[in-house]
Amino acid sequence: MTDLPLLDTDGDPASTRVVVAMSGGVDSSVVAGLYARAGYDVVGVTLQLYDHGEAAHRRGACCAGQDIYDASEVARTLGIPHYVLDYESRFKEEVIDRFAASYASGVTPIPCVDCNRTVKFRDLLATAEELGARYLATGHYVASRALPDGRRGLYRAAEEARDQSYFLYATTAAQLERLRFPLGEMRKADVRALAAEFGLPVADKPDSQDICFVPGGDYAQVVQRLRPEAAEPGDIVHLDGRVLGRHRGVMHYTIGQRKGLGIATPEPLYVIAIDAARQQVRVGPRAALSVSAITIDDVNWLGDIPFTDALARQADVYVKVRSTRPPVPAHLARATDGTPAVHLAVGEEGVAPGQACVLYDDAGAAARLLGGGTIMRAERVAKSVAEVA
């Protein structure tokens, strides 16, 4: 039998209600099974986030029609109540509209962060409270542990390849008190083994891959429908001012992109900046991608001292500027205009406005999440065209 994780709750299980956010996948289904088998008063909730009829033919997308059916079948197997909540309008406003607006303005969004910050945690926690639940549990791969001062902290997952802490940096300290992530200390193989032990019909269901509301990964289709100006063609301009060609619309490009530029040059060129107001995509050599400092906005801080103190002390941190990158050493500071900034010990490439700059206390596999913010601006290591020529 597979070892069971610590469910980390207070009180008698039978009198403790736990709402489990059930996407219809194996991870959240196992979470529901863990709490149900331990004797908790479990209520399964699945969010209808968009017109699932349009997406029902697709595999690999969260909460499409098949996923809602799968979640209900898991709940039936476990003998727990299950509700489907229509969150479509708030999901469109908080996630899809922001996603399209970001691409139209030349920045690269992370819709999963917006969804976790708003629909899944802010709104679903409120719904859990209305249902009389003490906790909301999800199938995210991130660890939540009690801190010495009684608060809770977030840590990278035991299985590094599955770690989702980057996407959960905006989770607030208050939310952490009521959130539980039992899979953070587990490995995926053990989760699937538990699904089989519990007799769950989704034990062999493939993992989701795409952004849930993007058919087949074609995000441009979504953006163009909502913000057609993002598909307007414009100039591809070298950092030295030369116009090298035409682009297909700013929504097709992101910082660090090399493929798909459609221009022939003797040296490889990369997207360095996107000026949506001028409908320009600016390109240059790889050396121009290296960034030494980042300013951030909408900061969520989970550290032990106030964020203002951490800035004043220029606290050492480790940062991830993309979910697939390892944490790198940096320190906090204030930019000349007073906004929070992160100074990198070594230049990082592909730092894109709109993406997340996520802070940790070290670079290890068990690092604690200290928070993060949205990237506003990036200061390149090379200050002039001559330096990268």
Swiss-Prot record:
ATP binds at A21, M22, S23, G24, G25, V26, D27, S28, L47, G139. It catalyses: S-sulfanyl-L-cysteinyl-[protein] + uridine(34) in tRNA + AH2 + ATP = 2-thiouridine(34) in tRNA + L-cysteinyl-[protein] + A + AMP + diphosphate + H(+). Keywords: ATP-binding, Cytoplasm, Disulfide bond, Nucleotide-binding, RNA-binding, Transferase, tRNA processing, tRNA-binding. GO terms for molecular function: ATP binding; tRNA binding; tRNA-uridine 2-sulfurtransferase activity. Its EC number is 2.8.1.13. Residues 162-164 are annotated as: Interaction with tRNA. It is an enzyme of class 2 (transferase). GO terms for cellular component: cytoplasm. The keyword Ribonucleoprotein does not apply. Belongs to the MnmA/TRMU family. Catalyzes the 2-thiolation of uridine at the wobble position (U34) of tRNA, leading to the formation of s(2)U34. This is tRNA-specific 2-thiouridylase MnmA. It comes from Xanthobacter autotrophicus (strain ATCC BAA-1158 / Py2). The lineage of its organism: Bacteria, Pseudomonadati, Pseudomonadota, Alphaproteobacteria, Hyphomicrobiales.
